[in-house]
A protein has these predicted regions:
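Short alpha-helical
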Residues: 49, 94-98
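Short beta-strand-to-coil "C-cap" segments at the C-terminal boundary of structured domains/repeats
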Residues: 127-132
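Conserved GNAT acetyl-CoA-binding A-motif
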Residues: 73, 80-92
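Acetyl-CoA-dependent GNAT
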Residues: 1-56, 60, 73
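Conserved catalytic-core motifs of GNAT/GCN5-like acyltransferases
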Residues: 89-93, 104-125
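Conserved acetyl-CoA-binding loop-helix of GNAT-fold acetyltransferases
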Residues: 59, 65-78, 101, 105
Length: 132
């Protein structure tokens, strides 16, 4: 995905084969456009337990704080609920405080931290119930 290579937080973006592998089953891939692609969000049925895993997403820096990420997340959550998923799960890194704040503001809770050195690489697992 060419767009992911333009998101500065993604140090080493995944190759297309990884996207194909993860999206082999039930998935949702969204692209936001403002004359051109400016953001994306991809999720899939990773755990096969009624949860939907929000795997990857980002917005080009020039288009942040314009509601793009909010719109993508709203669509993903609505789609997941309509497709009988009960939870949205995501994993981020401690260094992505903007993503953590965005998720907390959307009603996610932190469920687990996987400590990694250096500390900013610590993985933060979050979830949001879709039944409310």
């Amino acid at each position: 995905m060419d767009l992911s290579s333009k998101i500065p937080e993604f140090n080493s973006p995944y190759k297309i084969d990884e996207y194909k592998k993860r999206c082999a089953g039930k998935y949702l891939a969204l692209i936001a456009e403002i004359d051109k692609p400016v953001g994306f969000k991809i999720g899939y049925d990773r755990f096969k337990n009624g949860s939907f895993y929000s795997w990857m997403g980002g917005v080009l820096p020039k288009f942040r704080r314009m509601g793009v990420a909010y719109s993508l997340a709203n669509f993903q959550e609505k789609w997941a609920a309509e497709n009988k998923f009960s939870l949205i799960l995501l994993k981020t890194r401690k260094k992505h405080d903007g993503m953590i704040a965005f998720s907390l503001n959307r009603g996610f809770i932190i469920t687990e931290e996987t400590q990694i050195t250096p500390d900013e690489e610590t993985r933060i697992w979050m979830q949001k119930s879709l039944n409310s």
